[in-house]
Amino acid sequence: MLNYLAYSWLERNYKVETAIEMLMTAYNKKTNDPYITDSLGWAYYKNGDFIEAEKYLNYAIQLKPNDPVITDHYADTLWKLDRKIQARYYWQSIIESKSNELDKKVIKNKIIMGPNII
C-alpha cells in the first residue's frame, strides 16, 4: 500500500521527500519486491540522484527482467548516466516485447532522442 501511494505522489511531484521515506520503509520490509524496488529507484531518479537510482533499478530489473515499466525506468536512468548504448538496448527490448503497457511510439522516440523529449 505504501508503494502505490508513494509512487502516485512521485508522479505528481507531491511530497517527494516523504514519498522516498515511505518507499524506503516499504523496501526495508520487502527487499525482494521488484515494484517497491523500482519505485524507490524511480524516486531517486525524480530527485536527480541517478547513481542511487541506478542501484535500485538495476536490482529491480534483475528481480523482474521483462517488466516494461521497470525496463523503461532503468533505461531512462542509464541515459542520464551517459550510458546511451545500454539505454537504447533496454528501450529496444520494450519495442520487441509483446507488452502493450507502454506507448511504443514514445519508446521509439526515446531511442532516437532520449527521455528528455517527452
Language model feature labels by segment:
Residues 80-118:
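Terminal, low-structured helical/coil segments at or just beyond the last alpha-helical repeat
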